[in-house]
Structure formats: structure tokens, C-alpha cells
């Protein structure tokens, strides 16, 4: 027979043998896709390792002391490694110490930290500062003692304030956007370029993103601020007593109390 009954849902569809043969011939005419050999290699571009064992690396008894895989992935935040910035633990200790001495909550400390940062922008972070620092409550000045801020700052207050560098820079940018503004540190250094106002505070942290011009301005301002500063290793020792005995005899005819005659000459009559 030339007809084939297709067993489907209703069993009534009829397919001719001719249609089946034509479909088979079409499939034979198509070429099969070639299988990819799993063992074949493509012409890939070679990648060189940035750090190889052929370098002159530190060795102990023939064993390399570096873990190269870890070293390649080790890319910490640069500023976290600066020894000019207090560590996170030191900053936390300073914060908790100030909060305890001021007897404030965390929310209240957030309000205190803002004006203290602005005060440091204007007045600097010298270790010699003392007395009080001032914040403004509307038109009213509110004074706070500086002692907790300075005494709890380890190693120094400037190293603590380096944590505020980015926030202080953004604050100065905001002030400059609303009108002419130059921090007092820049006014004392006679900084004339208003575009560099964002760098005119003494706890600015120079980093890889700082432009060459700004870095030069920061270095010049720091050199000018420290030009007349002398650090003495030892101060005056107050525990000094005279233990020598003066046995020299003097008369009224001596030139002075330390000299009998002046090159053989007596005292003038």
C-alpha cells in the first residue's frame, strides 16, 4: 500500500510512503557536523606570569619564603598600610576614650565629630594645642575641652585625623561650591590658587590619586609650616646642683671677681 496510518491522538492522520521517502533523501543530503576532538589544542595566546620562580626571590635553605599565589592576589588598600595613619584599633580606642570622657552616646558622638573635624581643618592638629575647641550651635559658640581629644590620640592626633582626610576634602569642596572659601591653614601659607583649597589642611593624606601639582603644594605648605620648628631631644635638666667649691681669693684691687689683673695691669684708680 502507498499509505501509512500515523498513530497519533486520533489515529486518522494518513501519511503517504512518497512523503516519507522524500524526507529521508533530504536528510541524507545534509552533512553531519564533525565531532571536536577533545585532545586537540587551539592556537591560544600565551599568558606570562607577573611573578615567576625564576626571579631572584628570598630563599631559606633552598626553599622560597614567599607564597607567590597569595602575593599575586594580595592588593590591599594602600592607605591602610601607611605608618602615618593610626591603625583601625588605635582609632577605635581613641573614639571610645573620647566618648567615655565626654559621657556621650554614639549618636551624640556623630554630632561632635563633625564640628571637631571642621575645627581641625581651620586650626590644625599640632600636638601643642590645648585649651578648648569650639563648635557653633546656630550663632552660639559651644566650648569643649581639648584634653580628651589629644590625650587619647595614639600615636598622635594628626595620625588619628588622617582617617578624616577624605571627608575633610569633600567638606571643603562643598563649601567652595557655595561660595569663596579657603581654610585658615591655606590662608597662613598664602595659598593663592582657590582650586587647591581642598588640600589646604594639615592632616590631608597624600595618596596615589593626588595630582603632581597638588602634591607639590602640600609639600611646600608643610615645609613652610615647619621651617622655624626646632625639636630638642633633651630639655633643661632642673635637677642640677653646684657641688664644686670656689677657693679663689680676691681682693678689692682685682679687675673683677674672676680676674686678678688685666694682662698685668691693675684695676683703674
Swiss-Prot record:
Residues 9-36 have a biased composition (Basic and acidic residues). It holds the Pfam family Poty_coat. Residues 1-45 are annotated as: Disordered. It comes from the Viruses. Genome polyprotein of potyviruses undergoes post-translational proteolytic processing by the main proteinase NIa-pro resulting in the production of at least ten individual proteins. The P1 proteinase and the HC-pro cleave only their respective C-termini autocatalytically. 6K1 is essential for proper proteolytic separation of P3 from CI. GO terms for cellular component: viral capsid. Keywords: Capsid protein, Virion. Belongs to the potyviridae genome polyprotein family. This is Genome polyprotein. It comes from Passionfruit woodiness virus (strain Tip Blight). The lineage of its organism: Viruses, Riboviria, Orthornavirae, Pisuviricota, Stelpaviricetes.
Amino acid at each position: 500500500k502507498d499509505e501509512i496510518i500515523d498513530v497519533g491522538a486520533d489515529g486518522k492522520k494518513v501519511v503517504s510512503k512518497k512523503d516519507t521517502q522524500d524526507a529521508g533523501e533530504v536528510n541524507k543530503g545534509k552533512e553531519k557536523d564533525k565531532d571536536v576532538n577533545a585532545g586537540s589544542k587551539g592556537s591560544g595566546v600565551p599568558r606570562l606570569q607577573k611573578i615567576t620562580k625564576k626571579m631572584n626571590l628570598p630563599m631559606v635553605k633552598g626553599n622560597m619564603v614567599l607564597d607567590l599565589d597569595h602575593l599575586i592576589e594580595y592588593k590591599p588598600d594602600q592607605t591602610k598600610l601607611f605608618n602615618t595613619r593610626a591603625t583601625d584599633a588605635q582609632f577605635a580606642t581613641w573614639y571610645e576614650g573620647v566618648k567615655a570622657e565626654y559621657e556621650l552616646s554614639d549618636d551624640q558622638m556623630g554630632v561632635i565629630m563633625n564640628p571637631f573635624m571642621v575645627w581641625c581643618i581651620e586650626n590644625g592638629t599640632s600636638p601643642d594645642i590645648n585649651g578648648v575647641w569650639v563648635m557653633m550651635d546656630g550663632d552660639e559658640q559651644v566650648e569643649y575641652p581639648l584634653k580628651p581629644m589629644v590625650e587619647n590620640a595614639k600615636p598622635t592626633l594628626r595620625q588619628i585625623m588622617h582617617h578624616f582626610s577624605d571627608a575633610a576634602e569633600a567638606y571643603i569642596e562643598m563649601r567652595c561650591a557655595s561660595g569663596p572659601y579657603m581654610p585658615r591653614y591655606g590662608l597662613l601659607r598664602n595659598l593663592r590658587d582657590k582650586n587647591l583649597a581642598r588640600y589646604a589642611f594639615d592632616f590631608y593624606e597624600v595618596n596615589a590619586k593626588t595630582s603632581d601639582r597638588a602634591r607639590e603644594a602640600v609639600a611646600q605648605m608643610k615645609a613652610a609650616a615647619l621651617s622655624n620648628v626646632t625639636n630638642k631631644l633633651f630639655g633643661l635638666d632642673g635637677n642640677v646642683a653646684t657641688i664644686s667649691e670656689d677657693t679663689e681669693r680676691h681682693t678689692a684691687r682685682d679687675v673683677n671677681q674672676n680676674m686678678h689683673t688685666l694682662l698685668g695691669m691693675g684695676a683703674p684708680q
